[in-house]
Amino acid sequence: MATLKIAPTLLNSFDFYIGCPESWKVKAYEGLVSTIKRAPFKPTPEITKGLNFEDQVQKRVEGCLQFGWKNHELPGSTEFKIVVDRCMYGKFQVWGERTYDVPGYGKVKTAGKADVLFPKGSDHFQYGKIIDIKTTGNFKDERKYTESWQPLVYGMFWEIPYFQFLVAVWEDTGSTKIKSLKAINMKLDLETAEERIVNQITNFYTWLNLNGLWEDYFHTYCKNPR
């Protein structure tokens, strides 16, 4: 049975292409099409560094809970230890998904993994909380994060309106030393979330058809047989 699916990263790429300056259009289009066609992707050193940071946070949390480690007595920067404390007692790498009815196309599945999830009813967050850990060597402002589709899509997985980005800012792009930590707190409007997500998917599908990319999306991105 054919399946339609979409990740918030693809919606972000589409948003970026539509809204970017004309001088960036060619590069933005190429990046969007590469995602649709699942072009081979080699993680950049920055991405690898970020993944390693997330892994270190998870291992520190697990060590504290399983073996009684004292976070603030162990090596690491103050910023790193704050991230660990914020994630303590949360569940790491939790898979979530939700299906939407998109007029003219049928059911479309969204899916992804939360870096850290505090489910509803947890001892530490009664109404639940989702944390996403980010790293960057060049923090400009919060809009890169707050305007992303990730919080809204992920919030709908578990119907949790509280989302937090923890952004570790390196001293520079080549460094592994944290200069500062940004906590970006969001309260999501889940009442309008489904309508917004469905509208965005519909706009994207219209664009795919107008640009002759539906078959690539349907067969390559969604992995439906030809």
Which residues make up each language-model segment?
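An active-site-proximal "capping" alpha-helix that borders the catalytic cofactor pocket
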Residues: 147-158
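Short, solvent-exposed loop/turn segments at secondary-structure junctions
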Residues: 99, 136-138, 169-172
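Active-site-adjacent loop/helix micro-motif of nuclease/hydrolase catalytic cores
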Residues: 139-146
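Short, mixed charged/polar active-site loops
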Residues: 107-111, 125-128, 176-183
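Conserved catalytic cores of phosphodiester-cleaving nucleases, focusing on short active-site segments
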Residues: 53, 112-139, 154
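Metal-dependent nuclease catalytic regions and adjoining charged, substrate-binding loops involved
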Residues: 9, 160-226
